[in-house]
Curated annotation (Swiss-Prot):
It is found in: Cytoplasm. SUPFAM superfamilies: Thiolase-like. Induction: By stress. Experimentally by elicitor of P.megasperma, yeast extract and dilution of cell cultures. CDD domains: CHS_like. One of its GO terms (biological process) is polyketide biosynthetic process. One of its GO terms (cellular component) is cytoplasm. This is Stilbene synthase 3. Belongs to the thiolase-like superfamily. Chalcone/stilbene synthases family. It catalyses: 4-coumaroyl-CoA + 3 malonyl-CoA + 3 H(+) = trans-resveratrol + 4 CO2 + 4 CoA. It comes from Arachis hypogaea (Peanut).
Length: 389
């Protein structure tokens, strides 16, 4: 008679979860940050607010963003004038866009990841879909299964409204699924669209104005699995450990509410300070078991919530400027794409490491960290191990 422990052993993978493929995608509409203030105040019929426009221009300049991708074009906004007001009911129009566009761009990213993976789609056993954009029943995870033609028996997990920390959350969930289900192959898709948050300016809401200068659209797809098939699957990173922390006393620092005007949000000025004050605790908890205390000796994939956050974390940990280069490059070229951002950084890092002839996917280093920061205030920490190139 087979023992319960024997059955459980057979059901589980032997090795750690690994990243097997990465794909990214953006809407074709690319905006120039240097001229966005003019565009934004024109399309929202707010050019009479000259002082606020000047303030918004300064905010745009301080972001250190050069370009962002957005589904919303001037034509779409003209067809939906309520989306250009600060406080006009427009949720129906926004939701209709989300249900269509979030899975569409997600499919584009997923198709790229599946192609790199090199295995038939029939081997995908689980789907994790994450978005802060819109809500539907059945979810956009269902829509993606239809668009891709995935097996209807794929076990799916729909994560709505997690926010900017969720890149770490989906990895934490995927690691558990891959390591506890033999031969599991988990497709993660994070797809974000700012049509849910776009609105006109208000002199009494600087949080919204900062968001209009910072957030962008994008999707990333990742395939996670343990025990890679030799000569077929090529690991990119190993997922060593994961952790989540709700920072004490940080209630009200970051959050959002779904209203008739769309998704409204608030961003406390203390957010960069809260994150930087808690970053060393997160690092020590993650790396003390590995005997690592020099955080310049690891590679960094940090969610680019904004320039001030990166600056304060860099200063607090005494990081060399090059440690955040991949993160800052993604922020500069794409803006803040919420949950998808960390995977754009991961993709850039592994490609750049190969191009520069480094020995591992993690800038030539063995160990690294992935951080997600978001509503709560929540910090997600993922310890990564690179793979030899």
């Amino acid at each position: 008679m087979v023992s319960v422990s024997g059955i459980r052993k057979v059901q589980r993978a032997e090795g750690p979860a690994t990243v097997l493929a990465i794909g990214t995608a953006n809407p074709p509409n690319c905006i120039d940050q240097s001229t966005y203030a003019d565009y934004y105040f024109r399309v929202t019929n707010s050019e009479h607010m000259t002082d606020l426009k000047k303030k918004f221009q300064r905010i745009c300049e301080r972001t250190q963003i050069k370009n962002r991708h957005m589904y919303l074009t001037e034509e779409i906004l003209k067809e939906n004038p309520n989306m250009c007001a600060y406080k006009a009911p427009s949720l129906d129009a926004r939701e209709d866009m989300m249900i269509r566009e979030v899975p569409r761009v997600g499919k584009e990213a997923a198709t790229k990841a599946i192609k790199e993976w090199g295995q038939p789609m029939s081997k995908i056993t689980h789907l994790i879909f994450c978005t802060t954009s819109g809500v539907a029943l059945p979810g956009v995870d269902y829509e993606l299964i239809v668009l891709l033609g995935l097996d209807p028996c794929v076990k799916r997990y729909m994560m709505y409204h997690q926010g900017c920390f969720a890149g770490g959350t989906v990895l934490r969930l995927a690691k558990d699924l891959a390591e506890n289900n033999k031969d599991a192959r988990v497709l993660i898709v994070c797809s974000e669209n700012t049509a849910v948050t776009f609105r006109g300016p208000s002199e009494t809401d600087m949080d919204s104005l900062v968001g209009q200068a910072l957030f962008a659209d994008g999707a990333a797809a990742i395939i996670i699995g343990s025990d890679p098939v030799p000569e077929v699957e090529k690991p990119i990173f190993e997922l060593v450990s994961t952790d989540q922390k709700l920072v004490p006393g940080s209630h009200g620092a970051i959050g959002g509410l779904l209203r008739e005007v769309g998704l409204t949000f608030y961003l406390n000025k203390s957010v960069p300070d809260i994150i930087s004050q808690n970053i060393n605790d997160a690092l020590n908890k993650a790396f003390d078991p590995l005997g690592i205390s020099d955080y310049n000796s690891i590679f960094w994939i940090a969610h680019p919530g904004g320039r001030a956050i990166l600056d304060q974390v860099e200063q607090k940990v005494n990081l060399k400027p090059e440690k955040m280069k991949a993160t800052r490059d993604v922020l500069s070229n794409y803006g803040n794409m919420s949950s998808a951002c960390v995977f754009f950084i991961m993709d850039l890092m592994r490609k750049r490491s190969l191009e520069e002839g480094l020995k591992t996917t993690g800038e030539g280093l063995d160990w690294g960290v992935l951080f997600g920061f978001g509503p709560g205030l929540t910090i997600e920490t993922v310890v990564l191990r690179s793979v030899a190139i």
